[in-house]
């Protein structure tokens, strides 16, 4: 069950950088100065997804009940705004290195904001990129994230919605230390130049190279930013219709696609088709994750999570921000069907 926090009087940290399409701010708890991230639902022209913050909270609760390492989200009130809140994943001596930094560090021609690069965002591109930073063993965590997304129907696992917690510490270098570092960098760049010249790529203005030049230490972060799921974009009328129309319900699930693509053409696949393809190469990992989900899945527990998720929401906010029983029923039905389809992959 999610807790409720009134963070109106907490200390806002406007100098912190936040990303994404939703209204966000960073605050610190005055009791212990711990850092939290607060965000509301998406609200812009043509897109008023009021239940979106609930999707974040529900997916977090369900994910953790099924054995996934998902960041905990709770309900929060910030002035006149209602949204979800999560505690910072990293300490002051750590930082979150987002996937986008790893992908662009691996391939300098990759431009995630350029539509022509969208098709490059594939499972194997991610695999190659993390391997280049000596993080190849973490591919299991990437697969876990993809399987988690299939359960909640998340369609927005973009490059900034996954990453690694890495050591971070500001250090002032002496002149001697700085000269030593720059000398090593100079030697490394010379090696790269020699490699390119030897392979006749240095004089090609469009040439680029992918090389393992760094070793990164760190761990895969908890799964975060998973609010684009659970039919959060559907109106109350559409929710009621989906509950009574099996064709519409099945079509909605079938249309759900992963943001992480597949193949040389970078095609977007249905969540379950993507997992089937990954399973061809990583059957032991995929089957292990799915079997663990099946062993932890308790239909009554999932229903209890969903139907009590807004129990701590104050009564004066319930009419405007509470979830209807119809929406809760649809969310439960979606989770139940998606887990069944996931189970069928390994049968």
Functional labels for PLM-detected ranges:
Residues 1-110:
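Conserved ATP-binding subdomain of kinase catalytic cores across diverse folds
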Residues 51-53, 135, 140-141, 324, ...:
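Aromatic-acidic/polar surface patches that form glycan- and anion
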Residues 89-146, 171-191, 204, 312:
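ATP-dependent phospho-/nucleotidyl transfer catalytic cores
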Residues 156, 161:
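Conserved catalytic-loop position in the HRD/HxD motif
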Residues 162-167:
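Hydrophobic residue at the +6 position relative to the catalytic HRD Asp in the kinase catalytic loop
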Residues 169-347:
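C-terminal catalytic region of ATP-dependent kinase domains
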